[in-house]
Structures are given as structure tokens and as C-alpha cells.
Amino acid sequence: MLFHVKMTVRLPADMDPERAARLKADEKALAQRLQRDGTWRHLWRIAGHYANYSVFDVPSVEAMHETLMQLPLFPYMDIEIDGLCRHPSSIHDDDR
């Protein structure tokens, strides 16, 4: 199942800078691992915002939820999720 996900990060203004740096480093490492294994198919920064648009490929809604919950920055994110399916007018069978 493909999901389009918008993630907006909202770190508290008073968060310890070292803790924020650790969370960001851990987030980057996990995001890159998920990209390498094909779970996190696309990752795009939204210009001018601490936010991204992503496409995930997971087996179920539950797996999508679990994947997002394991992100180190999850507690500080506003997340919007939409399920995706192939459009009948698309000239491509896949996006890879």
C-alpha cells in the first residue's frame, strides 16, 4: 500500500539543543535505512518549512502507523496521511 504523508516538525522552543541534535541525527539515520529498504519511497522537503512530503510503501494501515511511531521526531510532528492508488489515466505502471 502506498501512502502520501505530510510531516510537519514542531520542536519546542525550549528544547535542549543537544537533545534536538540527537533526535535529528537519529531521525536521519532511520529515514535513510527505511529509504534503502524501500519502505520510504520518496522524501521531499517543503520549501520554507520544517516539513516534508513523503511516499511510503507498507503492507497495511497498521504498518504505516507503526512506521511513523518509530520515528524519533514522531512526538513533535503533525502528520497528515492519504492512501494512494494508481490513476487509470497514468501512462506508467509504477513510479520506480
Model-predicted segments: where are they?
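Conserved, structured core segments of small domains
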Residues: M1-R96
